[in-house]
Design a protein with these regions (language model features):
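Extracellular/periplasmic catalytic domains that process cell-envelope and extracellular macromolecules
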Residues: 9, 56-60, 157, 290-293, ...
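Active-site SXXK
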Residues: 17-43, 170-178, 258-261, 265, ...
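Structured C-terminal helix/loop/strand segments within mature extracytoplasmic catalytic/sensor domains
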Residues: 269, 323-377
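Short, conserved catalytic-motif segment at the N-terminal edge
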Residues: 1-18, 39-41, 151, 155, ...
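Short, glycine/proline-biased beta-turn/loop segments that scaffold the active-site neighborhood
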Residues: 42-56, 196-197
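Hydrophobic (often cysteine-bearing) scaffold residues that line and stabilize catalytic clefts
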Residues: 18, 22, 27, 165, ...
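Short, surface-exposed loop or secondary-structure junction motifs
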Residues: 59-318
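A short, well-structured edge-of-sheet supersecondary motif
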Residues: 1-9, 42, 131-143, 331-334, ...
Length: 377
């Protein structure tokens, strides 16, 4: 069903918030297409394609380092804090324990201020040319905020170049895609992949194309969206405050549509008889791996040396590529056995910290394990 309290059964065409599965189902696909066309090289500096990074400590970071999560860029940054009016509340915004002004629980040991406002110059209640970035119902960000995020990333101090999974890496890759293609990334993906592949249930900003009732709700009361149910708006804060189209999250889709992308990849760039990517590009991105982590070029992979830390079933071969998402999603493609495994859920409903059994019980790897065990019989 859609939720614990609902008797509405999930249909095969109902859309889920993919969360970080967006990275490989959207952003990486666009990156591979532009690489295929010779628009950049993996050792190119990202600052060649994002002028805002020139003169910062990110200037020498390469595209390959972003894809491998070895850029030195921090894992996360709370961009949304810049939009909050600090004069609208007293004391701290967060507290480890509830008190008279902190009743809203957002994590196991974290509570947020009950009442706060957004800066009026950055957030409006209605859409306009100056406020086009929709964050939720009756919440529209100023058009300048998206560009300010790139400036903020440029100012964040760079750390060492060890492996550090970071959503910011893929936010930068999305910016690169748009600067090279001269198109919004969602429209680029529609044109190059989603429309010709008949992925009719895949979209950024899904409420522009689908009814709310066709989209599975993600959380019941999001504190940054004034306690509203999130249904059709991306849950990830960074993607939300980019206006819903981001490189790290924002895509909504179905299991059937997601499977098409990974079938395309293990079939060497061909889907339903049409070529979308060269075999050489697919081979490179599917086989290139980091020397210091389990990661591939944008893809996550099994940890063959540590099954406890591996995101995949122990039986999954090292050739497997894919990704997971915070909302309870994953997709894994196995070119060796020619298998595609996709699992979508809204495991963070009603509150992200309430239902962690999907991770604690390793449900996703165990489901994948059943598939491999059946294959071995």
């Amino acid at each position: 069903t859609f939720t614990y309290e609902s008797d509405r059964k999930v249909e095969k065409d109902d859309l889920y918030d993919l969360a970080s599965l967006t990275k490989t189902t959207a952003t990486l696909l666009a990156v591979m297409k532009l690489y295929d066309e010779g628009k950049f090289g993996l050792t190119d500096r990202i600052s060649q394609y994002i002028p805002a990074l020139k003169g910062t400590d990110k200037e020498r970071v390469t595209i390959e380092e972003l894809l491998l999560h070895q850029s030195g860029i921090p894992a996360f940054w709370p961009f949304y804090k810049e939009t909050i009016d600090k004069d609208s509340y007293k004391g701290s915004f967060y507290r480890a324990r509830p008190d008279a002004s902190h009743h809203t629980q957002i994590d196991t040991r974290l509570y947020v201020i009950d009442k706060f406002d957004y800066r009026k110059e950055l957030m409006a209640k209605t859409f306009s040319a100056d406020y086009p970035l929709q964050v939720a119902d009756s919440m529209f960000l100023h058009r300048s905020f998206r560009d300010s995020i790139m400036v903020q990333i440029g100012r964040i101090p760079l750390k060492d170049r060890r492996y550090r999974y970071s959503c910011l890496n893929f936010m930068l890759l999305k910016e690169m895609v748009e600067n090279i293609s001269k198109m919004p990334m969602n429209l680029f993906l529609d044109k190059e992949f989603y429309k010709p592949m008949e992925m009719n249930c895949t979209a950024y900003l899904p409420l522009r194309q689908f009814k709310k009732e066709e989209i599975v709700p993600t959380v019941k009361a999001d504190y940054l969206r004034k306690g509203k149910v999130l249904q059709g708006y991306v849950h990830d804060e960074s993607a939300a405050f980019m206006g819903g189209v981001s490189g790290n999250a924002g895509l909504f889709s179905t299991a059937r549509d997601v499977a098409k992308v990974y079938q395309l990849l293990i079939d060497g760039g061909v889907y339903n008889g049409k070529r979308y990517l060269s075999r050489e590009t697919c081979d490179l991105f599917l086989t290139h791996t980091s020397k210091i982590s389990r990661r591939g070029l944008g893809f996550d992979k099994p940890d063959v040396n540590n099954s406890v830390k591996s995101p995949c079933a122990e039986e999954a071969p090292e050739e497997v590529i894919g990704h997971t998402g915070f909302t309870g999603t994953c997709a894994w493609a196995d070119p060796k056995n020619h298998l595609v495994f996709v699992f979508l859920s809204n495991r963070i409903y009603p509150r992200p910290f309430d239902h962690k059994q999907l991770m604690r019980l390793n449900i996703r790897p165990r489901m994948q394990q059943v598939m491999y065990q059946a294959l071995m019989k």
